[in-house]
């Protein structure tokens, strides 16, 4: 068994233990040993307090936690036959905030975490991608901050915004504010075209097969070339099973298994505490090894 005591690239520390057989991972176990306890923090609190607490689960993806919280609170009203009517404008502002944060996260993920590690496979000199001093690294940080400025216009602050509320949002951006948001996001699009993909935005959106990856000219092309040079496409392959819950209006919910698409049934999502530490559990149980719960779909 091989163990990585601290798994990086995630929010919060984790421990990874792998069992190998014939140079292939035959079993893996991930332990989250830092107690967060948000479920216990929320006990006894007013329901709306969750809008303040849960975005603080993560300093990167707080919008996702906020959106999930507001959906849960609105679901309560729906279950007592008092559904809240959310306007299309409010829905759109929620989606805009969520997707701006996704764009910000992708820029940071690519330039701060992934690309430097891939380059180190080829050379110790990171050059323009060097953290804190490389010109491209600094450009990426500036671009990410511009997207967050756009989000702050409707969110009031970042991170840990709480502008989504049951029934809608607490912002009503003016035309000037919307123009400012567009300017911030236009700068991100220009960086995307010039530095990330090296092609026109519309041309990139026209890509519909892996063969089109050869048209890339930017940093993504550099990443592509290094990945194939070191056969990274052969690593980490799983079981070709993917799930999207459809929490964004941009994507329909569904399950893909062996290239067949199936309708997603949320009643088949199950949460298990069999291997989870419990505060009220005084009996030492060898099965319990993590503070996280296990989630499965259709067994």
Task: Report the location of each language-model feature.
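Active-site bordering "gate/hinge" segments
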Residues: 1-299
